[in-house]
Amino acid sequence: MGAQLRIYRRRIRSVRATAKITRAMELIAASRIVKAQQRVVASTPYAEAITRAVSAVASQSNVDHPLLTERARPVRAAVLLVTSDRGLAGAYSANVLREGEALTEHLRERGLDVVHYIIGRKGLAYYRFRDRPVVRSWLGFSENPSYLQAKDVADALIAAFNTPADDGGVDEIHVVYTKFVSMLTQTPEARRILPLEVEETTEEPVGGMFPQYEFEPNAAGVLDALLPRYVEARIYNALLQGAASELAARRRACKAATDNAEELIRTYTRLANAARQAEITQEISEIVGGADALVATGSE
C-alpha cells in the first residue's frame, strides 16, 4: 500500500505543477486579448475603407492595372496560411490548415498549381512533416504582429504576383486566416486579395447620386499608390484577427486544461486517501492480530 500511496502523491504533485502553468498561460492570454481585440477593431475600418476606395477608383476609371487584371489563363495560385507559433491553442491552427486544404483542393479542381506561404511554426511544421514545399515562411510574431511585418509579407506576395507564371510567379493570391467574431467565436476564413474583385453596382447610393471622382495626377498613379497599401492593410488585418483568435483559443484551451487538472487532482486525492485509509486499517489489523497472539501465548 505504501508504494501505491507514493505513486498517487507523485501524480498529484505533477498535475498540480501542470495546472500552475496552464493557469498562468490562461491569465496571460486573458490580459493580452483585450489589446488584441482593440487592434482588430481599430484596423478593420481602415482595411474595409481602402478596399472600397480601390474598388471605386477601379470602377470609375478605364485603367488596366496589373494588380486588378484577371489573367486570361491562370496557371498558379498562392495561398497564405496564418497559423500560430505556439501550441496550447486548441484547434486554432488545425482549423486554418483544414480550411487551407479545402481551398487548395478547390483551386486544383480549377486546374491551378498551388504554392504555399506560411505564417507561424505550427503551419510550417505541418507542411514539413508531410514533405510539402513551402515557398516562404515567417515565424515569431503570430501573437503580436506589426505593420512592418505585414508589409514584408505583402511585398513578397506582390513580387510573386508581378512575376510571370512562366518564371515562377502566381496569377492569384489567397489568404486563409481566423476571423475574430467574439471571445467565444472564431471562424476560419479564406479570402482572395489579388487580383482585386471590383464590385460594381447599379443601385443608387444614399442621396440619389453616384459620387464623381477626379484623379490627381491620374487614375493609374492613384492605383499605383493605393493597391500596395490595400494588400498590406488586408494582410495586416488578417494577422490581427488571427492574433486575437489565437489568444482567445489559448485562453479557452488553458482554462479547460486547468479545470481538467483540478478534477484529476481531486480524483487522485480521493484515491490517495483511500490508499492511506487501507494502509492504516491494515496496520491496525496487524497490531490487533499481534496483540491477540501475545495474549494467547501468555494464557498458555
From Swiss-Prot:
Q: Which GO terms describe its molecular function?
A: ATP binding; proton-transporting ATP synthase activity, rotational mechanism
Annotated NCBIfam families: ATPsyn_F1gamma (TIGR01146), PRK05621.1-2 (NF004145)
The transmembrane segments are none
Give GO BP annotations, semicolon-separated.
proton motive force-driven plasma membrane ATP synthesis
The gene that this protein is the product of is: atpG
Work out whether the entry's keyword set contains Protein transport. Answer: no
Q: What is the protein's membrane topology class? A: Peripheral membrane protein
Keyword Ion transport on entry: yes
The record's subcellular locations are: Cell membrane
| Any one GO CC term of the record | proton-transporting ATP synthase complex
* Alphabetical list of Pfam families matching this protein: ATP-synt
Q: What's the chief localization of this chain? A: membrane
Protein name per the record: ATP synthase gamma chain
Subunit structure as annotated in this protein's UniProt entry: F-type ATPases have 2 components, CF(1) - the catalytic core - and CF(0) - the membrane proton channel. CF(1) has five subunits: alpha(3), beta(3), gamma(1), delta(1), epsilon(1). CF(0) has three main subunits: a, b and c.
